[in-house]
């Protein structure tokens, strides 16, 4: 199994520890960078991990930045990626088993290396439990990736704003 991994400069050491762990378990690791502590931008490496997964160069991906929020948002912009930002085993297993997540994201300054490694190991071993409900949910998520001309309409949210002004939504 091939695992793509990427990070920003803040968590290069953590990424290398995770990479070494994966290699010790017999996985092939595709290191998408960054490779040092020179200041860089996490979207670059989230995109690289996502592209490696959707282009089938890797089976799964791991993204790490300081909090995990930025790189996870970036990788989720790659069509075909379903990434979950996790800090615990339950969330990681749910993401894989119910939503067929193909990337997992971490805050390397939030979650310790050993816990990340344990969670990643369980995530890799977990299997998607296909059900009609799960398939429908994943299809709805995938539909959000589609480009719709209506989204470019400057009045796209007008209806909702008017409802807000009329008090139809609760705070």
Swiss-Prot record:
Transmembrane segments: none annotated. It holds the Pfam family LacAB_rpiB. It comes from the Bacteria. GO terms for biological process: D-allose catabolic process; galactose catabolic process; lactose catabolic process via tagatose-6-phosphate; pentose-phosphate shunt, non-oxidative branch. It catalyses: aldehydo-D-galactose 6-phosphate = keto-D-tagatose 6-phosphate. Pathway: Carbohydrate metabolism; D-galactose 6-phosphate degradation; D-tagatose 6-phosphate from D-galactose 6-phosphate: step 1/1. InterPro entries: LacB (IPR004784), RpiB_LacA_LacB (IPR003500), RpiB_LacA_LacB_sf (IPR036569). Keywords: Isomerase, Lactose metabolism. Its EC number is 5.3.1.26. GO terms for molecular function: galactose-6-phosphate isomerase activity; ribose-5-phosphate isomerase activity. Heteromultimeric protein consisting of LacA and LacB. PANTHER family: DNA DAMAGE-REPAIR_TOLERATION PROTEIN DRT102, RIBOSE-5-PHOSPHATE ISOMERASE B. HAMAP family: LacB (MF_01556). Belongs to the LacAB/RpiB family. This is Galactose-6-phosphate isomerase subunit LacB 1. It comes from Streptococcus pyogenes serotype M18 (strain MGAS8232). The gene is lacB1.
